[in-house]
Amino acid sequence: GLLSGLKKVGKHVAKNVAVSLMDSLKCKISGDC
């Protein structure tokens, strides 16, 4: 249903946010932005 669809989308978004956060963190640490 709608709820499981929303959960799936939420997981996808959370994963993308986590990945981009990690990327910007790596960039700040290593200094190659």
From Swiss-Prot:
Expressed by the skin glands. It is found in: Secreted. Its main location: secreted. One of its GO terms (cellular component) is extracellular region. It comes from the Eukaryota. GO terms for biological process: defense response to bacterium. Disulfide bonds join C27-C33. Pfam families: Antimicrobial_2. Coiled coil: none annotated. Keywords: Amphibian defense peptide, Antibiotic, Antimicrobial, Disulfide bond, Secreted. Belongs to the frog skin active peptide (FSAP) family. Ranatuerin subfamily. Antibacterial activity against Gram-positive bacterium S.aureus and Gram-negative bacterium E.coli. No activity against C.albicans. This is Ranatuerin-1T. It comes from Rana temporaria.
